[in-house]
């Protein structure tokens, strides 16, 4: 299970660099606890352009991650966190989503089967990364930037479904929040 960090697991606060400002999104802890109980590895993938822009450094990024893990608790295990510190101008050679590079690296590092994985994100770029990594299930959540990006996500999914040259082979699930996620989508028992 791949999840974006800001706007999915934690409240999106523009260029968050202070661990005292980290707040979990509703349903984040429960979802990760359910995944852990069922043996599903959880990988966080996150774009952090604030590093490239000089708003914060890798140490501040790590402190925010540490606070996230502390708030989630031991019952909500995270296998790894992959972060990209490039800005939008770094495309297409960076790990920055929509590149699938972070997902592909995690699959190799952790021996994950991407065809048995899903991604939950709040931005179109999250879902594009999942599609480019050939994940079969993508979920878009309205938290974070999700409300603003939902129309673009729906348009993109429609275009992918009707494409003859690049049929994505994924299912898109639209969620209001992580509280609406149904573990049976993964074969998980809640």
Predicted regions and their residues:
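Flexible, glycine- and charge-enriched loops at secondary-structure boundaries
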Residues: 18-25, 57-62, 96
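Gly/Ser/Thr-rich helix-start
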Residues: 8, 51, 55, 122, ...
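Substrate-recognition element of Asp-dependent hydrolases with the DxDx(T/V) motif
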Residues: 28, 32-65, 76-90, 130
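Short, small-residue-rich loop/turn micro-motifs
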Residues: 5-7, 85, 142
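A short alpha-helix capping/helix-coil boundary motif
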Residues: 9-12, 47-49, 82-84, 105-107
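Surface-exposed cleft-lining segments at the edges of enzyme active sites
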Residues: 14-20, 52-53, 90-91
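Asp-based, Mg2+/Mn2+-dependent phosphohydrolase catalytic module
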Residues: 59-79, 87-119, 123-190
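Active-site neighborhood of HAD-like aspartate-dependent phosphohydrolases
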Residues: 1-43
């Amino acid at each position: 299970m791949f999840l974006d960090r800001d706007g999915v697991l934690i409240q999106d606060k523009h260029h968050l660099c202070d661990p005292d400002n980290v707040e979990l999104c509703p349903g984040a802890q429960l979802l990760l606890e359910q995944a852990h109980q069922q043996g599903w590895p959880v990988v966080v993938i996150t774009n952090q352009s604030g590093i490239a822009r000089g708003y914060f450094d890798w140490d501040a990024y790590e402190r925010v991650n540490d606070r996230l893990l502390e708030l989630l608790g031991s019952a909500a295990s995270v296998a790894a966190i992959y972060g990209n510190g490039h800005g939008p101008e770094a495309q297409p050679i960076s790990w920055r989503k929509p590149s699938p590079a972070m997902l592909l690296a995690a699959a190799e590092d952790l021996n994950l089967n991407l065809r048995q994985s899903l991604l939950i994100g709040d931005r179109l770029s999250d879902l594009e990364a999942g599609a480019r990594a050939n994940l079969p299930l993508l979920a878009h959540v309205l938290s974070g930037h999700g409300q603003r990006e939902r129309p673009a996500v729906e348009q993109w999914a429609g275009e992918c479904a009707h494409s003859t040259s690049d049929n994505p082979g994924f299912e898109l699930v639209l969620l209001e929040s992580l509280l609406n996620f149904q573990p049976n989508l993964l074969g998980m028992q809640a």
